[in-house]
Amino acid sequence: MFLVIRVRGTTGVIKNIADTLDMLRLNRISHAVLVEDTPSYNGMLQKAKDYITWGEIDADLLAEIIAKRGKFTGNNKVTDEYVAENSDYKNIDELAKAVIAGEVKLMDLDIKPVFRLHPPRKGYEDIRLSVKEGGSLGYRGENIKDLAERML
């Protein structure tokens, strides 16, 4: 499971890349979504790599993101009580583990698929360079945790 974050804006985006970003539901800067590690999603990530960054997410970070930035229908915050009432899981931590394992999707519980994060504290490295070149774009692997924690 990947966490995908949009880094760059909409100005000058080629139409097919803009369509890919729309399919990923990344409409604004600092929005984040979860995607599965499938060949079709990998192709979409490679196509939009000059506007996004992504990496593997673990259950602890996902639980923190859901608790702080998760919203359900009506723009209400996701709480342990909401998860216990509307699912088979007792709290957000158990839900996060189930989402990572692929047992359940956030949409099944009416949790919005897009997380609206803050811009990162201390800023991005460089929004025009890849991670390998010292920038912020492209595949990060496990280092997505550092960026996501700065954005919560």
UniProtKB/Swiss-Prot annotation:
InterPro entries: Ribo_uL30_ferredoxin-like_sf, Ribosomal_uL30, Ribosomal_uL30_arc, Ribosomal_uL30_CS, Ribosomal_uL30_euk_arc, Ribosomal_uL30_ferredoxin-like. One of its GO terms (biological process) is maturation of LSU-rRNA from tricistronic rRNA transcript (SSU-rRNA, 5.8S rRNA, LSU-rRNA). SUPFAM superfamilies: Ribosomal protein L30p/L7e (SSF55129). One of its GO terms (molecular function) is RNA binding. Pfam families: Ribosomal_L30. It comes from the Archaea. Transmembrane segments: none annotated. CDD domains: Ribosomal_L7_archeal_euk. One of its GO terms (cellular component) is cytosolic large ribosomal subunit. Keywords: Ribonucleoprotein, Ribosomal protein. The keyword Ribonucleoprotein applies. The keyword Nuclease does not apply. Part of the 50S ribosomal subunit. Belongs to the universal ribosomal protein uL30 family. This is Large ribosomal subunit protein uL30. It comes from Methanobrevibacter smithii (strain ATCC 35061 / DSM 861 / OCM 144 / PS).
